[in-house]
């Protein structure tokens, strides 16, 4: 396998037809993904309370305590058995009406290079976009957003089209 780079990750995203909303060339200070997710959730639930019960973050990140040894593997196996999907996007809005697609957002930092700093981050990202591409092929609105503002704008467009 070739060495993973930011450029190769972005090229793969494009090949799979997964949209990135935001400026991929931006480099600079920005909020972390968790802050962006909280901002997106607050904007959606405050401005669209009628959809608040349909909108949620998928908490599928897991950092094991190295002192626990094999507990990490047991925890991962248990999560997998319960249907936790590795690579699932960060934010989901279930269909806002009958016939509307789900809204699936993978949140990255405004400076995407900060989200994809390590080889491990890049591999995980490729797994995420493969899943997003599959979900998009099955009718979902599935994309990567560089910050909450872009995701929120995409949500407004989604509501205008599907309400």
Predicted features by range, described:
Residues 1-163:
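Catalytic phosphate/metal-binding cores of nucleic-acid and nucleotide-processing enzymes, i.e., regions
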